[in-house]
Amino acid sequence: MASSIVTSSLKPLAMADSSSSTIFSHPSISSTISSSRIRSSSVSLLTGRINLPLSFSRVSLSLKTKTHLKKSPFVSFVAQTSDWAEEGGEGSVAVEETENSLESQDVSEGDESEGDASEGDVSEGDESEGDVSEGAVSERAEFPEPSEEAKLFVGNLAYDVNSQALAMLFEQAGTVEIAEVIYNRETDQSRGFGFVTMSSVDEAETAVEKFNRYDLNGRLLTVNKAAPRGSRPERAPRVYEPAFRVYVGNLPWDVDNGRLEQLFSEHGKVVEARVVYDRETGRSRGFGFVTMSDVDELNEAISALDGQNLEGRAIRVNVAEERPPRRGY
């Protein structure tokens, strides 16, 4: 009796179409189906599948078979979402391209602005440099450098003559542009020569005529044209005139430069008096040299002092021989 009731109640289910709504005649089945629909509403929306209780396994089989034969809405849903993803991807690419284009516009505008600024800076800098160079040229035109031909060599300077004293001396011949005494770097002492640059060649020639063989502090100056720049400078010649220089021999050991100068100053003006000393012991070698101012005084000193007794020794006085120049190897 029970099996006939179940069979008769399941016939409408087997004949029903899954696409149309199904009317169940048995109240327990309909209530069970409705409760299962409420519990699995999210699943039925995706798959369209109706889950029945396990007690009715045959009905569940028939329903599963029919739902698989139908076209699953889940596939279409996935396809639609794939299309949306592609559309979204295209849209994102378009957005990125738009952003890139905007950024490129910003960069190009920035480059143009920077380029304009740099061009402005360069042009302003060039103009300012141009002004400075023009000013420098104008200053050079107002203050030209003195001519090399107006530069003079001054030799045989006394060691106490400085650059200021040299300039004051040569101002008697004209305008002095530069006056310089050369000093030893190690000892900071004068080397006995210097250079003077006059304002013109004519004034330089006047200075040569006026101060060559000029007596400055007891020494005769040597003044001539200086060697041009770039050429090898000639060594300053020593001014020891044989006619004015005498040799003094057999001197007592305690006679120094001052005593020798005092002895010869009684017969004229003494330019230089020097006793020769031994470099190792520092003792006098018993001879020296005296330079007189002219030939008359020289001859008078020789006549008066040669053979004279000086502190118990007869000194010898005669004209000094000029030493040959040393050759460098």
UniProtKB/Swiss-Prot annotation:
Q: Where is the transit peptide?
A: 1-77
Location of this chain's protein in the cell: Plastid, Chloroplast
Cellular component aspect of the GO annotation: chloroplast; chloroplast envelope; chloroplast stroma; chloroplast thylakoid membrane; cytosol; ribonucleoprotein complex; thylakoid
Q: Which SMART domains match?
A: RRM
Give the top-rank taxon of the lineage listed in the UniProt record for this protein: Eukaryota
**Which residues, renumbered to this chain, carry the PTM Phosphoserine?**
123, 128
Null allele phenotype: No visible phenotype under normal growth conditions, but mutant plants exhibit multiple specific editing defects in chloroplast transcripts. Mutant plants have increased sensitivity to cold stress.
Annotated sequence repeats reside at 108-112, 113-117, 118-122, 123-127, 128-132, 133-137
Annotated stretches, region: 6 X 5 AA approximate tandem repeats of S-E-G-D-X: 108-137
Region feature (Disordered): 87-145
Q: Name one GO molecular function term.
A: mRNA binding
Among Gene3D superfamilies, the record links this protein to: 3.30.70.330
Which keywords appear in this protein's UniProt record, sorted alphabetically? Chloroplast, mRNA processing, Phosphoprotein, Plastid, Repeat, Ribonucleoprotein, RNA-binding, Transit peptide
What's a single GO BP term from this record? innate immune response
Q: Record's Pfam families?
A: RRM_1 (PF00076)
Q: Where is the RRM domain?
A: 152-228, 244-322
Cross-referenced PROSITE patterns: RRM
Please outline how this chain is modified post-translation: ADP-ribosylated by the Pseudomonas syringae type III effector HopU1. ADP-ribosylation reduces the ability of the protein to bind RNA.
Ranges of compositional bias, category Acidic residues: 96-132
The free-text function statement in the UniProt record for this protein reads:
Required for specific RNA editing events in chloroplasts and stabilizes specific chloroplast mRNAs. Associates with the 3'-terminus ndhF mRNAs and protects them against 3'-exonucleolytic degradation. Required for normal chloroplast development under cold stress conditions by stabilizing transcripts of numerous mRNAs under these conditions. May modulate telomere replication through RNA binding domains.
Q: Under which name does UniProt file this protein?
A: 31 kDa ribonucleoprotein, chloroplastic
Species for this entry: Arabidopsis thaliana
